[in-house]
């Protein structure tokens, strides 16, 4: 396959500017070509009484990401896989299902315990780049997120569990391992994507 980019050379063009423009136009190829070094994932709760919580939404999100990154994906294959995985459980589980670039599925499970203790969180030091395509998909490519452990050292080892992220517009976005949910007047709200 061949993909061409070009630009209009005018009297005040510089080679550096033209090269930068060509790289910018070709960025779409680079964003999707990263599909070799990571997997997609969804983490969900399974309980004996209710099965997988919000299963349809998890499947739809994985399907959308698989389409974006051109990963082979079958809703039916995932549903069968999750059903077989659930057959091993007798107690609530935290289930992470991973899809690699070959369409292969793998699970990681652990017993689920209701979090009764409070999490200690703090605001991240630096903003995330809301244009980073990996913020819009759940992937194993986690280097886009700051590490709570690194920031914990900055805060004197206070035992920080997670970081509240914000973007370059100073808008709160999410935590590194969870969603931000705010209750106002009895209604629950989450920020839009990144």
Where are these regions (language model features)?
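Helix-start/capping segments and mature chain N-termini
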Residues: 2-5, 10, 14-194
């Amino acid at each position: 396959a061949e993909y061409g980019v070009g630009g209009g050379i005018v009297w005040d063009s510089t080679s550096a500017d033209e090269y930068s423009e060509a790289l910018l136009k070709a960025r779409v190829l680079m964003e999707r070509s990263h599909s070799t070094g990571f997997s997609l994932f969804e983490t969900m709760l399974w309980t004996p009484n209710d099965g997988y919580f919000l299963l349809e939404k998890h499947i739809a999100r994985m399907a959308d990401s698989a389409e974006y990154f051109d990963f082979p994906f079958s809703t039916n294959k995932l549903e069968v896989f999750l059903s077989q995985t659930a057959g091993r459980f007798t107690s609530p589980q935290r289930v992470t299902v991973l899809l690699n670039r070959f369409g292969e599925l793998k699970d990681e499970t652990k017993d689920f315990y209701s979090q009764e203790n409070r999490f200690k969180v703090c605001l991240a030091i630096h903003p995330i780049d809301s244009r980073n395509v990996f913020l819009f998909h759940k992937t194993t490519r986690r280097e886009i997120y700051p590490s709570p452990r690194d920031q914990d050292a900055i805060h004197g080892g206070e035992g920080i569990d997670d970081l509240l992220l914000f973007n370059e517009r100073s808008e709160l976005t999410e935590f590194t391992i969870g969603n931000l949910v705010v209750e106002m007047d009895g209604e629950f709200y989450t920020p839009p994507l990144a």
